[in-house]
């Protein structure tokens, strides 16, 4: 059984999570994966570990984790891989990215999830400057 886990960034406002949930519902409607669930990087639940545990408990033998992020960054390159137990980078200096705005990040626990024997975990890239994204940006620019 295959599960798709979409990872959203999360926000103090509901919009971010709601959009990712809507994307998940639309993917579910296409009947490609046995299970489609959402996990949030920060601020909201379910967390990534909660969601991965849920899909494994439901019988998933392959878990495809796909960030619903436009660009690679600290979350997609470090935080999410750490949670998935697949981070291979150097962690010296810890959390050393800086924002030019004042707010405190509320990251969920980044303890790696337990992946049982016999379960395959696959981690995918964020969307990037895909031509389909370009079309959406141009539609928005044209008021569509």
UniProtKB/Swiss-Prot annotation:
Catalysed reactions, semicolon-separated: Co-sirohydrochlorin + 2 H(+) = sirohydrochlorin + Co(2+); Ni-sirohydrochlorin + 2 H(+) = sirohydrochlorin + Ni(2+)
Pathway where it operates: Cofactor biosynthesis; adenosylcobalamin biosynthesis; cob(II)yrinate a,c-diamide from sirohydrochlorin (anaerobic route): step 1/10
Basic residues compositional bias, start-end: 95-108
Database matches in Gene3D superfamilies:
3.40.50.1400
Q: Which UniProt keywords apply?
A: Cobalamin biosynthesis, Cobalt, Lyase, Metal-binding, Methanogenesis, Nickel
EC number from the UniProt entry: 4.99.1.3, 4.99.1.11
**Amino-acid positions noted as binding Co(2+) in the UniProt annotation, renumbered to this chain:** 9, 75
Query: Mind telling me which SUPFAM superfamilies this protein's record contains?
Result: Chelatase
The record's active-site residues are: 9 (proton acceptor)
Where is substrate annotated to bind?
45, 70-75
Q: Name the InterPro entries for this protein.
A: CbiX-like, SiroHydchlorin_Cochelatase, Sirohydro_Cobaltochel/CbiX
**Which biological process, per GO, is one annotated for this protein?**
anaerobic cobalamin biosynthetic process
Please verify whether the record's keywords include Metal-binding: yes
Q: Which family does it belong to?
A: Belongs to the CbiX family. CbiXS subfamily.
- Assembly and partners? Homotetramer; dimer of dimers.
This chain belongs to the protein called Sirohydrochlorin cobaltochelatase
């Amino acid at each position: 059984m295959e599960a798709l886990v979409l990872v959203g960034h999360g926000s103090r406002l509901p919009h971010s999570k709601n959009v990712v949930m809507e994307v998940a519902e639309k993917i579910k409607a296409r009947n490609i994966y046995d299970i489609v669930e959402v996990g949030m990087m920060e601020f909201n639940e379910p967390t990534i570990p909660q969601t991965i545990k849920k899909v494994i408990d439901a019988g998933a033998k392959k878990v495809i984790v796909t960030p619903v992020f436009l660009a690679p960054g600290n979350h997609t390159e470090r935080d999410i891989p750490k949670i998935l137990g697949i981070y291979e980078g150097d962690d010296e200096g810890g959390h050393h990215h800086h924002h030019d705005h004042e707010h405190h990040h509320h990251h969920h626990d980044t303890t790696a999830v337990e992946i049982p024997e016999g379960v395959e975990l696959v981690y995918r890239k964020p969307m990037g400057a895909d031509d389909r994204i370009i079309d959406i940006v141009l539609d928005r620019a044209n008021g569509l």
